[in-house]
Amino acid sequence: MKIPLAVILGPTGTGKTKLSLELAKYLPVEIVSVDSMQIYQGMDIGTAKPSLEDREKVPHHLIDIVLPDYFFTVAEFRERALKVIEEIYARRRFPLLVGGTPLYYKVLFGEFSIPHVPPDLEFRRKMKELAEKEGEYKLYEELKKIDPKTASKIHPRDLKRIIRALEVYYKVGKPISELAGEKKEDRFYISKIGLYMPRDLHYRILEERVDKMIEQGLVDEVRNLYLKGINENFVSMQGIGYKEILRYLRGELTLEESINLIKKRTKEFVKRQYTWFKKYKDIHWFDVSQYSLSQLAKLVYNTIINDWENQGYKYQNREGVNYFND
């Protein structure tokens, strides 16, 4: 059975959450978060989670599902997301995937499989110590020797992914590129919606977004996590905003320096998101600065329905209550 679903993706700060809630007025949907940071409990401000009020209006999934000290793998995301998608459709509603974590989309839609190798915390600690002593490029060069294909897809300074690739190799004796071979699947009718805006406007919104997070209490949020033992050794604390505020709390940066660093890294991250998403040719891109929210929701609604119908899904009654192929 093929399941019709829609995706709202795009870089941080483009209004994905607002659009998803507005779209819910036109389609009977439940929202599946595709965000690698919103999975963590107690990390609300820095991850820009939908409010509890919004989550009561429209059911949301894969938010607040693990504690910040838990190492959540991409393989786990795929397993949980597929289960949730099937459950949503069984309730006669449509899954609406919303978020900006490119790797999650890639593994969910079967572009490659991820080996389910449990994390080795001791191995990671040793690798981080080696990187601190001899530099990140030392580990990157090692990865290039054992798995050049994977290395070519990872930035030389992306220490987390470099260590993970090395970890998989030393655990199972095979490079991750060999284990994660292409495995395309055809289990969904998919409509992909991408959001963007002019760069100057986007950067201004990103800066305002960071300032708002500080006003909402991001410093206290990070302080509470740190007091519970959550530090930079945990994946959850690698999110932009958290590690910079942690440095402020330790006296390594002033608050102004940490805020400026958050803004700088957020803009850099957005550039990488654009680069990744632009590789895909089957995304319908919308400049959000050109429409009101209601106008955009109507355009996106029609685009989704047309995509589904072009792929063979019979969307029966746009005005009625029966949207399913009964």
Curated annotation (Swiss-Prot):
Q: Is the Nucleotide-binding keyword given for this protein?
A: yes
Q: Name one GO molecular function term.
A: tRNA dimethylallyltransferase activity
Q: Which GO terms describe its biological process?
A: tRNA modification
Q: This protein's superkingdom?
A: Bacteria
Q: What is its EC number?
A: 2.5.1.75
Q: Where does substrate bind?
A: T12, G13, T14, G15, K16, T17
The feature of type site (Interaction with substrate tRNA) is located at T101, R124
Q: What class of enzyme is it?
A: transferase
Q: Which cofactor does it need?
A: Mg(2+)
The reaction(s) this protein catalyses: adenosine(37) in tRNA + dimethylallyl diphosphate = N(6)-dimethylallyladenosine(37) in tRNA + diphosphate
Give the span(s) annotated as Interaction with substrate tRNA: 35-38
Its keywords, alphabetically, are:
ATP-binding, Magnesium, Nucleotide-binding, Transferase, tRNA processing
Q: Name one Pfam family in it.
A: IPPT
**Sites where the protein binds ATP:** G10, P11, T12, G13, T14, G15, K16, T17
Homology family? Belongs to the IPP transferase family.
Q: Briefly, what is this protein's role?
A: Catalyzes the transfer of a dimethylallyl group onto the adenine at position 37 in tRNAs that read codons beginning with uridine, leading to the formation of N6-(dimethylallyl)adenosine (i(6)A).
Q: How does it assemble?
A: Monomer.
Protein name, per record = tRNA dimethylallyltransferase
Organism the protein comes from: Dictyoglomus turgidum (strain DSM 6724 / Z-1310)
